[in-house]
Amino acid sequence: MHKDCDKRFFKKPEFYRLTGGNNYVRIDAEDKVTGRGKYAGDFYLPGMLTAKMVRSTHAHAKILSIDTSEAEKLPGVKAILTAKDFKWPGKLGNAEFAVEFADREVLVTDKVRRIGDDIAAVAAIDEETAQKAVDLIKVEYEDIPAVFDPFEAMEDGAPWVNGAPDTHNVGMATFRKGGTDPDEEFANAAFVYKEDYETHRMVHAAIEPHAATANYENGVYTIWMSTQLCFVDQYWYSHAMGVDPEKIRVIKPLVGGGFGGKMDSYSFGIVAAKLSEMTSRPVRMVLTREEVFQMCANRHPIYVHVETAHDKDGRLLAKRARHILDGGPYGGTGVAACAQSTIWACLPYKMRSVDVEARRVYTNNPHAGAMRGYTSCQIHFCHDVHMQLASEAMGIDPVDFRRMSVADPGYETPSGIKVTSCASKQCLDTVRKEIHWDERKDNLADGEGIGFAASGFVSGTGFPILDTPNRSSASVVVKINKLGHVTVYTGANDIGMGSDTAMTAIVAEELGLTLENTTTVVSDTHITPFDSGSYGSRVTFLSGNAARRAAVDAKQKLFEVIGPMWGVMPHTLECLEGKVISKQRADLQMPFRDAVFKWMAINGGDELTGVGSYSHEGTTAQYNSTSDDSKENFAPAYSFSASAAHVTVDKETGCIDIDDFVFAHDCGRALNRRAVEGQLEGSIGMGVGYTCFEHNITKDGKILNPNFRDYRFPTALDMPKMRTYYDFPADEEGPFGAKECGEGSAAPVAPAIANAIHSATGIKITKLPLDPEHIWRMLNGMEDDRHSK
């Protein structure tokens, strides 16, 4: 950023034109709908080979031998890769932050820990030949005892899966404590409620499967990959291959959905790169749908115990909670899930004391990692259903019960979370009004119910993966040519949510231009500036602030030339509707292009460049907080949501209809209303799937429904009437007042539906999913003995 760039040069709200009340089309929309856009599996390079992987068919076993001799004889096979081809250290991840980040080999050497572990890879002239070669490779195993239940995995004498042998398979533990003495709060409370809850495994099910195309040339590995973390992948791959990061170039093309599933430490990209080096030809690998289900990260099943203490009016005083996460056999980005789960236990409700403990346990189940909301969907289901049951036990209206305890602006949690802008009460008031709760609550028919939920989420997570030890960061560069056209260089990873458009709009707004005047160059580790990646709702807030600062930097440099020409102070100028204007004299204005040309004439013809970066100084975030008095603020801002669901339950069959869903989300100032509505409706859709349809059914570590035929999604016919509300106060720290809207909005869907089913039937709901069989069994007094694993 320009050394003299200051707040005086930031555009004031009265000059906003593009963001806020407008709907504008995404800059990648035409390429996507016409098929011109390229995804990682769409690249066809001369001489390109196809790669396939040999994967473990055993959940826990020693590898005695790998025989590739028959595959090597097959015509068309160009290379076969095994662990012996990786010199040092051959592991993916970043052990600098947590050793559990780097507990996974690129290709397994001597022990498989799950079905689907990567053992070997083949590069061949086409997919059919590659698959034949994979089938010819013989792997000899010796089975060893496996463990699939996280509670059994923590017992003495349980099979050791991963991590240090003396940790009882606990890969990560986080303790979130603070405030007054919890024992005293519970002892003196007017009412205490306790319950156990359980959530299930779910897959991201992005339309695009994971894919990579790699080309090794002139000593550089270039990898086009479906990823959420191109700079992180560059570092992880260089670490695993023992080469300098500059020798690895990761480019993120269009990505057909991520939802957290494309940010873990996978092998397919590095394997394609290594095979390209071995063959001196480009190599492409596209995972099958079955591979994505079994090998890629799923949503964590979590087992939760919650205790809450309340005063006589129902106000929340204190909370104790224990979270057990089934992480599968590896850490990866799932390491952060443990700490994240403790954050959601502290939001959105105020309390004087909190004591939350989370343990992520290694098992031989499929690997679990990040998924939209990073455990918030699971934790808010458990904790908000708990609030519903507690309100009923105390005989208090469920909305009033929540409203008296939700956070207010300026609230600081006992664990150190600092709430700034906050419309949680307004969100609850909105859904209460729009679902007509007060008129309908005493007039619901048999089998008809209304349920509510509230939640909170980070906006711009402080959890790092690469850069500073306790904060994530973003940088953006803006270049303006002699014609006044702007190019935005950002390392932010758009995975389908429209962040490229957001970055463009933020820069265009600050410079008083339209989207047509702006081009974006994104996510190329050799061209674009560093960005931590797409996770934790950080892109709009962190990368967006960096983009705005880059535009302000360029604008300030421009004004410091034009201002003296006009005899006015530089900070009294503004960019508006394609012109540079004086805010004080209407007669002083100039086309933006002409102003840039004058700047270049004075500065030797160089492009006008602005640089911006953002990392919130007040943010701290650790993966394994263990101190009783540690206080951590995880983000510069937090979003808040409330939802209301109206359902009808057929008590004969257990089938439910979600008739109406009202959603209010405090996302600050909406930059693009159409995009916000799409994110909120998408969150409802994914939440309906998580609650009522989608379930990765596993047996002995094997997913039994690893395809779109057997894994049930909600269709358009299953979706409720959706009404979304998001006009709430701007956040002072967010770019043009914006906060997140794509992840936190998924969290209150499941508890609202569960609470509505409880309202309609009276059955106590403590487990997901809520499919017809599950509901029918409970309606008929049968014990729900299904297990999330």
Regions found by a protein language model. Give the residues of each.
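Flexible, low-hydrophobicity surface segments
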Residues: 1-171, 462
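Glycine-rich loop/linker segments at domain edges
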Residues: 22, 27-34, 96-98, 102, ...
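Extended active-site and interfacial segments that coordinate phosphate-rich ligands
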Residues: 27-31, 135-144, 235, 239-240, ...
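Short beta-strand elements
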Residues: 31, 211-216, 303-312, 318-323, ...
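C-terminal catalytic domains of large/alpha subunits in multi-subunit enzymes
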Residues: 83-84, 242-247, 277-283, 312, ...
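Helix-loop-helix junctions that connect adjacent transmembrane helices in secondary transporters/permeases
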Residues: 159-241, 406-485, 704-718, 723-725
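Thiamine diphosphate
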Residues: 235, 254, 258-280, 284-286, ...
